Amino acid sequence: MTISLRAATVQFQHRASDKNYNLSIIERFIAQAAEQQVQLLAFPEMCITGYWHVRHLSDAEVRALAEPIAASPSLARIRPLAERYNMAIGVGLIELGDDGRCYNAYAVCLPDGALHVHRKLHAFEHPAIASGDRYTVFDTPWGVRVGVLICWDNNLVENVRATALLGAEVLMAPHQTGGTHSRSPHGMKPIPQALWQRRAEDPQAIEAAFRGEHGRGWLMRWLPSRAHDNGLFLLFSNGVGRDDDEVRT
């Protein structure tokens, strides 16, 4: 069994519905990770398709973005890189399932050609995107068992506990969060887009917002406990920058 695993996480600002652009950024980061001998690499939720804009799309437009996993053109670009660089690579997309429904999915491509897909258990992004119904835990070539929970899946303590009980030692937790329009009086709230637009002129202001109660501060209230309480490592990945009317942190 491997006693050490070099893991890395990526943040980038995706473009809405521009899969080719997003994949080009993903490929660039994979090459950089390979130079640093990364073995497990996590990208954010729905990083291939874009995220928050999908709520404005029609059912047909969501389906047009979706891809069947077995014949996914996007994953056909990622899987050979996992094999070439001996790396496990996790990416988010919209899956068109065999049942004809769409899913917020996270695909982990392994260097031996294996592919493991988690469907978000608590999907809310669009009425055409269904929720998954099972946990995802799998073995890796390094003797480490990995689980996946997408964004809000991690908010519920039972999901992480169930994933740990299935043997997960590392939890990949891809997100698109920060600066959200939470309806809870105790949840995070939007970050002014003007701060992001002026990030070059006033980097201290946007950094303070990112680290504050509507960004990292909110996550640090609860996310580390998921790892601590279940005796596992948590690999968090998030988008960054403007995402429709919100600002990711």
Label every PLM stretch briefly.
Residues 7, 22, 33-57, 82, ...:
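Active-site beta-strand/loop signature of hydrolases that rely on acidic residues for catalysis
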